């Protein structure tokens, strides 16, 4: 009889063992709004081969203050970029019971450092970042990618302007005219734009593919923000299993429970 070592799914994170108002790791934005701060270690070394990463952002939004921001997920001793420019501005305070959560089906080998860096309109200001890793000795139960391409960033820390419709779908907005790679998974990121006096709203954000007038919706996400300029995702924002060919046009649109307003968005394609 052969003996097979047990296979199991494992998790690892930088979450605090004891309740705290500053969960995870403080990652500080750069000295100018378009400059990333220094890389900050989030996890010293992965305990196992990682198949999926959840990132949770909080504590960067502030009432009456513009808080556009973006974040790079870095790996290895050289701080190589695994995911660039995840839009994460206006993330709510921990005491407001909200956060922004994104999931990426990406591979990180065992024994590798995980870090992050950020840029934001609120310069030299910390945001809290939690990373939850999934993997282990099992074969991955989902398709896993090795790299991620970000589309739609205009000038850091902002993505492409998306105008939300008032209780109706806004027009499709082009995020990129042509993808550089084929992608099997897309993740949207989305934030307010230079807001200092917004009202509370719920938002439905759609993303899709196709030429002008022939767009096909591939997925959707739900956000909500308060009148204190704090924006949350409602649940984990993974993306959608898709088959997007290289050279595809990616688009985004949004609808709001209030008046039409400007937001900005990006789409992250996993390969």
Q: What is the predicted function of each stretch?
A:
Residues 1-271:
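Beta-strand-centric surfaces of beta-sandwich/beta-rich domains
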């Amino acid at each position: 009889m052969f003996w097979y070592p047990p296979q199991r799914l494992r998790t690892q994170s930088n979450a605090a063992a004891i309740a705290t108002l500053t969960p995870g790791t403080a990652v500080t934005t750069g000295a100018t709004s378009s400059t990333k701060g220094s890389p900050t270690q989030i996890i010293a070394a992965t305990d196992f081969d990682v198949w999926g990463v959840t990132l949770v952002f909080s504590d960067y939004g502030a009432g009456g203050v513009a808080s556009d921001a973006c974040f790079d997920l870095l790996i290895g001793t050289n701080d190589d970029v695994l995911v660039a420019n995840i839009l994460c501005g206006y993330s709510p305070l921990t005491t407001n019971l909200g956060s922004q959560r994104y999931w990426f089906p990406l591979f990180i080998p065992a024994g590798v450092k995980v870090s992050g860096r950020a840029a934001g309109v609120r310069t030299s200001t910390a945001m809290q970042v939690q990373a939850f890793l999934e993997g282990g000795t099992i074969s991955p139960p989902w398709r896993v990618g090795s790299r991620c391409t970000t589309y739609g960033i205009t000038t850091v820390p902002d993505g492409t302007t998306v105008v939300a419709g008032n209780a109706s779908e806004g027009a499709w907005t082009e995020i990129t005219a042509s993808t550089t790679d084929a992608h099997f998974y897309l993740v949207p990121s989305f934030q307010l734009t230079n807001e200092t006096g917004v009202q509370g709203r719920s938002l439905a954000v759609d993303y899709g593919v196709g030429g002008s007038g022939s767009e096909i919706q591939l997925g959707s996400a739900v956000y909500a923000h308060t009148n204190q300029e704090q924006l949350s995702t409602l649940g984990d924002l993974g993306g959608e299993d898709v088959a997007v060919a290289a050279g595809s046009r990616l688009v985004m649109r949004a609808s709001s429970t209030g008046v039409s307003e400007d937001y900005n968005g990006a789409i992250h394609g996993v390969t």
